[in-house]
Design a protein with these regions (language model features):
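Short coil/turn segments at secondary-structure boundaries
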Residues: 26-28, 43-47, 76-77, 341-347
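Single, function-defining residue in the core of a domain
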Residues: 1-15, 19, 77, 108-110, ...
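Gly/serine-rich nucleotide phosphate-binding loop at the start of the catalytic core
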Residues: 1-63
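Conserved short loop/turn motifs at secondary-structure junctions
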Residues: 31-34, 64, 194-201
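Short alpha-helix boundary/capping elements
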Residues: 35-40, 51-54, 69, 105, ...
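Short secondary-structure transition/capping motifs
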Residues: 35, 50, 64-73, 123-128, ...
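Active-site-proximal, Lys/Arg-enriched surface segment
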Residues: 67-157, 283-287
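Generic alpha-helix structural propensity
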Residues: 26, 38-42, 56-60, 70, ...
Length: 448
């Protein structure tokens, strides 16, 4: 294995404890190969770009994923610590984003494969289903020095099984997984202020109650026909029967949106793309209730676009003292989760893996998601000032650095560390290493 940049060695050092010495040597090759390999992120493509095309014991590298003993949960805890250390100021609120995504896969031997709705290809009138794996990812959402918008950095990813193939007779929905992951993060960070932001698919009273029990602020989209209630009236002394948990039902948000006397307030909020936008909001507190579950106290925000470009929408927050501006700022940050899913597919080879064994499947995709966060922190280590070099062309002007620029910077530093050794100041000839020449001519031009 060639030498690595000192900045990368520092970030990799905490992960050494997860592996034995022999497995760690092979794991490093796969991690660096996944960063350098163009196109598919298979084990063989990682070996090829590392100059190990002639490695006869290539099965040892496959065993890192399908047989070796190590925990993705412990790796997620270590990665979360790195993200907080390098990107979250001390004492600041940690915003968490969670969502599920479908990795399209086919094959009879893939046990966790199911048929799911394809959110990317589907519309309101036309629903598209596909076979694949459902992944639920939790990310740290926050600012990075080189971008105006927040970035979502994955650190914990789990595989959701379809209901027909649920193991041990119990099926966990995406909401169940997010609740369990949220409790795990609270166990890791018992003293920090946490905010969990999810989309409308996770708008469940049970999840809101779980967040409230763990002292985690819960933010999500709210249906306009949601059942909202007033607090219960004081219980009369000596009155028999169970104490009421809710009072009279409040006016529906649909009615509030349709009324002409709704007391709208105008606010300027942080918007997508790092801009500002003026919106009209109406905010109150209520009890959110669904049958079979205890009601939870929330602050709802009904939002209207004065320009008429957006339809009315509502959002909720379990922190009753939060302002509408703060709630909407958290809601806008959630879109970075979708951007991360798209970036990992475009640049890290999500959906190009070819493993079929259950342990390898359960590890490969979480590792690739984790590499997104690892590359981001590593780019910050290479450029402490936050001024990343941006790749521009005559026909395309990029205003700020993106993940592709981070990955380009990391690759450049790796190649320079390996092959660009300093030459004497008086030298007339700089010799190009043969290993670099063979990689440039034979490996990098291979089709993706």
């Amino acid at each position: 294995m060639p030498s690595l940049p000192p900045e990368m060695i520092v970030l990799l050092a905490p992960f050494v404890q997860l592996f034995s010495d022999r497995v760690w040597r092979h794991a490093q090759v796969l991690v660096v190969g996944a960063l350098l390999a163009p196109g598919k992120r298979t084990v063989t493509s990682c070996l090829r770009v590392m100059g190990l095309s002639g490695e006869r014991h290539f099965t040892n590298y496959h065993r890192v994923l399908n047989r070796a003993q190590w925990s993705t949960l412990q790796a997620g805890e270590i990665l979360l610590g790195l993200l907080i250390t390098w990107l979250v100021p001390p004492g600041a609120v940690i915003v968490l984003g969670a969502d599920d995504t479908i990795e399209r896969r086919s094959g009879r031997k893939i046990a966790a494969k199911g048929c799911y709705r394809d959110a990317v290809r589907s519309s309101k009138k036309h629903v598209v289903h596909c076979f694949g794996l459902k992944w639920i990812a939790m990310m740290v959402v926050g600012p990075v020095p080189w971008a105006k918008r927040a970035w979502a950095l994955p650190f914990l990813t789990v595989l959701g099984w379809p209901k027909a193939k649920a193991r041990r007779g119990r099926h966990k929905t995406s909401v169940d997984w997010v609740r369990q992951m949220m409790k795990q993060v609270r166990h890791w960070l018992p003293e920090r202020l946490l905010v969990l932001v999810v989309d409308g698919g996770f708008a469940a009273v049970a999840l809101a109650l779980a967040c409230q029990e763990q002292q985690v602020t819960f933010v999500t989209r709210l249906r306009l026909d949601a059942a909202l209630y007033h607090p219960p009236a004081p219980h009369s002394p000596g009155k028999r029967g169970r104490k009421p948990t809710k009072g009279k039902r409040q006016r529906s948000l649909k009615i509030w949106a349709a009324r002409s006397d709704t007391p709208w307030e105008t606010v300027d909020v942080d918007w997508y793309g790092g801009t500002r936008k003026r919106l009209a909001v109406f905010s109150r507190t209520a009890l959110w209730y669904t049958s079979g579950v205890a009601p939870v106290a929330i602050r709802f925000v009904l939002v209207r676009d004065p320009a008429g470009q957006l339809s009315d929408a509502a959002f909720l927050c379990t922190e009753l003292q939060s302002s509408p501006e703060q709630i909407l700022a958290w809601v806008v940050m959630r879109w970075s989760v979708e951007v991360t899913f798209a970036e990992t597919r475009a640049h890290l080879g999500i959906e190009t893996q070819r493993q079929w064994s259950a342990p390898a499947i359960a590890r490969t995709t979480p590792v690739l998601f984790g590499l997104f966060s690892f590359v981001t922190v590593l780019a910050l280590r290479f450029c402490p000032s936050g001024q990343l070099p941006v790749e521009t062309t005559a026909w395309y002007h990029k205003a700020e650095a993106t993940f592709s620029d981070c990955l380009t910077l990391v690759r450049q530093q790796l190649w320079r560390t390996w092959f660009c050794t300093p030459s004497p100041l008086s030298a007339d000839l700089a010799q190009f290493p043969r290993e670099a020449f063979e990689c440039l001519v034979n490996d990098l031009p291979l089709a993706a």
